[in-house]
């Protein structure tokens, strides 16, 4: 009896470290629905891999700063290859402070088809403008072998649903003459698609 009790206590105590080392299941990454005038796009936001850039995007979503904005730029390099851009267009009432740059060499999030990224000037100047890749764009990734500013752009999310909507936006005609404050000639859509609302989805959605 005593021997069985000692064995049981030993087995119980031996199991404690294994139980203590069991890691909790990480929370799923947030998903955001962009309800546009062309249809719904759902993006998975990589809060686990690019937390600074992901949190910045989610602040714009949660504060409803993306409601009513448009896809104002389409860069068509080739058939279904390039990117579309949306954001607050530097509107003072909608902009939040700039964020620290997270290069792809640190996050591991590459500029692949359907990836969301943030435009910038110098590192640490990104704010409320966002791009979505059509096709893989490795030239946007950090490349330490290049001279000068080789940190690339910060990728932070991907399209989980609605690539057909994104393609519809990309394929829409652009104006040969329109510009935005003198820039992006030939890249401004004739009829920009509006983001009606941008909202987080519940995990079960």
Spans of features found by a protein language model:
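Cyclophilin-like peptidyl-prolyl cis-trans isomerases
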Residues: 18-205
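Intrinsically disordered, low-complexity sequence elements enriched in Ser/Thr/Gly/Pro
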Residues: 1-2, 29
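Sec-dependent signal peptide recognition
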Residues: 2-8
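N-terminal signal peptide c-region/cleavage motif recognized by signal peptidases
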Residues: 13-17
């Amino acid at each position: 009896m005593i021997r069985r009790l000692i064995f049981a206590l030993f087995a119980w105590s031996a199991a404690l470290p294994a139980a203590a080392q069991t890691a909790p299941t990480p929370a799923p990454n947030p998903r955001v629905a962009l309800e546009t005038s062309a249809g719904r796009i759902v993006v998975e936001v990589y809060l686990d891999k690019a937390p600074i850039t992901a949190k910045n995007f989610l602040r714009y979503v949660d504060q409803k700063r993306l409601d009513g904005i448009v896809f104002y730029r389409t860069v068509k390099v080739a058939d279904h290859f390039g990117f579309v851009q949306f954001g607050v267009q530097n509107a003072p009432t909608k902009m939040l402070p700039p964020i620290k740059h997270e290069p792809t060499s640190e996050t591991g999030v590459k500029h692949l088809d359907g990836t969301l990224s943030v435009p910038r000037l110098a590192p640490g100047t990104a704010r409320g403008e966002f791009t979505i890749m059509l096709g893989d764009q490795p030239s946007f990734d950090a490349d330490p072998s290049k001279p000068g500013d080789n940190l690339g752009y910060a990728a932070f999310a991907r399209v989980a649903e609605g690539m057909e909507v994104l393609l519809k936006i990309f394929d829409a005609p652009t104006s040969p003459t329109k510009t935005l404050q003198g820039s992006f000639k030939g890249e401004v859509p004739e009829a920009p698609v509006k983001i009606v609302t941008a909202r987080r989805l519940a995990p079960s959605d």
